[in-house]
Amino acid sequence: MSRTRRKKRKGRVRPLRLLLVVFVLTGLLAGALWLLYQTLDEKTVIELDAGHDQTQPGYVSDTLREADLDMEIVLGVRDKFAENSDYVIQLTHDELTDMNMTSRLEKIDKDNPDLTISIHTYEDPYLRKTGTLIVVPPSGSRKSISAAEKICASLQEAGRGCEVVRMAYEAGREGRSTVRYLTLEEDYPSGAESREIFSVDSAVMEIQLLNMNDTGDAEQWTDPAFKASVIDAIAKGILSIAE
């Protein structure tokens, strides 16, 4: 009789032990997933965008296209973070994919990164200087403004001029918006006309990087050392954001 009772008890105990093991394993798995989520959540997600599509890329010099230079700078900045596990670097498009501005802005809105840096090399006809526009959405975010200031400080330290400007939208038809460039305190230099671009419903902040060359000599972008200094300064500015 006693043996039969023991067998029955054993039969009851085994399912309880199994449930206990399942409960413990579930708890451990949940803890591991939470730690993984926390680790990913702590990473800074940065989206790099090479401006200008291939339909109207423009030229920085007689032989250097803006679209090619933009991509070269973007890839250079990305490579700086190849072994840095604190950052997740995404691209709106690569050198094999061509996307217009509207599509790229829509992707940025969908990805919702912590910071977006969009490179637009150009020669400003009003300021008679060559430089780069870095677009950091969303405008009004304290984090975006702080990031802009730190990247500018890094570029100024490297001897590159930098000015933070805000883009003011005026709603237009058929998905177009007229844009006025504004500094944080006053209007963009007099004489600069409003510029029209495609846009989506996202606020944008721009950093205008000027090389302080009053002659507007765009040929310096063909100098590998000059391009490397700009890439290094942008990367250094990004790293300083977390400090």
Give each language-model segment a name:
Residues 1-16:
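N-terminal Lys/Arg-rich, disordered targeting/topogenic segments
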Residues 17, 31-37, 74-243:
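Active-site-proximal helix/loop segments of hydrolytic enzymes
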Residues 60-82:
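An acidic helix/loop motif centered on a single conserved Asp/Glu
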Residues 22-30:
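Core hydrophobic alpha-helical transmembrane segments of single-pass membrane proteins
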Residues 43-63:
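Short glycine-rich His-centered loop
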